Regions:
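ER/Golgi luminal nucleotide-sugar-dependent glycosyltransferases, focusing on the catalytic module
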Residues: 1-231
Length: 231
């Protein structure tokens, strides 16, 4: 698959190789044991501090001992998020980003680059406080719930995902399927972004063929991955 991943359109490859997976909602003791072998880093950009409780509750399905790096935009938010982390007994840190340019992606790739590149973690869980205030409220809530539920639905759900990483060293990333309820993404999810994305890919020396209409992508920029797969 590693060669195919470099030469095939991503959505064609996922379809033809049957790489869409319905995650079981129960897990055996062996599955939990395999999941526990993975050192898990969670990175959460919490721009909306009032969502800190919701995010910590979602992350509570991760194996005990995970480490959280939360990023936010100011010191007031930082103190509020720290207080929530203390209530949940979560080990970690809260960083104030130098700029909100790039939003959660900039905070992840720039402000958290040191932990991502440290080699200390087997798995990184990336989420953020998603409100999509520019969209219809109900559609935005469905989008957020779609992402949270597909990645962090329950302890058994997460254990099955982590066990897959443990069993398959070539597995690089798990992501939610295309969100489409309330959004016109089916059949034309690139919108106006295809040409700019191709220009950036050319600058970076990425030669993987692009999907024509619906890119296989982490819509909402939330996923579970190996840090090495991001470089």
């Amino acid at each position: 698959l590693s060669n195919l991943a470099r030469t095939s359109k991503p959505r064609d490859l996922v379809t033809n190789a049957g790489l869409t997976w319905v995650v079981p909602q129960s897990a055996s003791e062996e599955t939990y044991a395999a999941a526990a072998t993975q050192k898990v880093l969670a990175v959460a950009h919490i721009f909306y501090a009032d969502m800190a409780e919701e995010i910590l509750e979602r992350l509570s399905v991760l194996p005990k001992g995970y480490y959280l790096v939360a990023t936010t935009s100011n010191e007031e938010n930082q103190a509020q998020i720290r207080a929530v982390m203390e209530r949940y007994g979560v080990e970690g840190e809260v960083r104030v980003v130098a700029s909100n340019r790039g939003r959660d992606i900039g905070a992840f790739l720039v402000d958290c680059n040191d932990v991502l590149a440290s080699g200390k973690w087997d798995i990184v869980v990336k989420i953020h406080s998603k409100k999509s205030v520019q969209d219809d409220y109900n559609a935005a809530q469905l989008f957020k719930t779609h992402l949270y539920d597909n990645l962090l639905n329950s302890r058994a759900h997460v254990a099955n995902i982590l066990a897959e990483f443990a069993a398959h060293p070539a597995l690089g990333m798990v992501l939610a399927p295309l969100p489409h309820m309330g959004y016109p993404t089916m059949g034309h999810a690139w919108f106006t972004n295809r040409e700019p994305a191709q220009a950036v890919a050319k600058r970076l020396g990425i030669n993987v063929p692009f999907d024509k209409d619906m890119p296989l992508a982490t819509y909402g920029s939330m996923f579970i991955a190996r840090p090495q797969a991001l470089t």
